[in-house]
Amino acid sequence: MSEAPAATPSKPRVLVADDEQVIANTLAIILNQNGFEARAVYSGEKAIESLDSFQPDMLISDVIMTGMTGIEAAIATQKKMPNCKILLFSGQAATADLLEKARQDGHEFEILAKPVHPSDLLAKLRG
């Protein structure tokens, strides 16, 4: 009898949300080239809409976006998918106030400063 081939482990799925489409697309390309299955969306609302169909292992989101902020998207993601890891990034000083409000509400998120160097991002995802 022959043994069934070992199942190929699936690539970790990463949902990238940023209203700057070039940044979202670039990060998704880098992740796809480095062993992840990544999808780019351009708003917090689209990130939430994509959860059921994409089933990400991780959400990477800009904090300051038009409409729903990255923190709001992260909180909604945690409620819907408690095992989904969250990593936020921002290039704006106003982020501190939003993060403090989230902490007061019981939410802790890791945040990286923009611009995010690809090697730093990959290290965070793999570490």
Residue spans for each PLM region:
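Charged docking surfaces used in two-component/phosphorelay signaling
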Residues: 25-33
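Acidic catalytic/metal-coordinating carboxylates
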Residues: 42-46, 69-73
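The short loop immediately C-terminal to the conserved phospho-acceptor aspartate in CheY-like receiver
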Residues: 20, 63-64
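Hydrophobic/aromatic residues positioned on beta-strands within the core alpha/beta folds
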Residues: 89-91
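The feature encodes the CheY-like receiver
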Residues: 24, 66
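Short hydrophobic/Thr-rich beta-strand motif most characteristic of the beta2 strand and flanking loop
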Residues: 35-42, 50, 112
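Non-catalytic signal-transmission and effector/linker regions of two-component phosphorelay proteins
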Residues: 1-13, 117-127
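Active-site beta3 strand of CheY-like receiver
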Residues: 54-60, 87
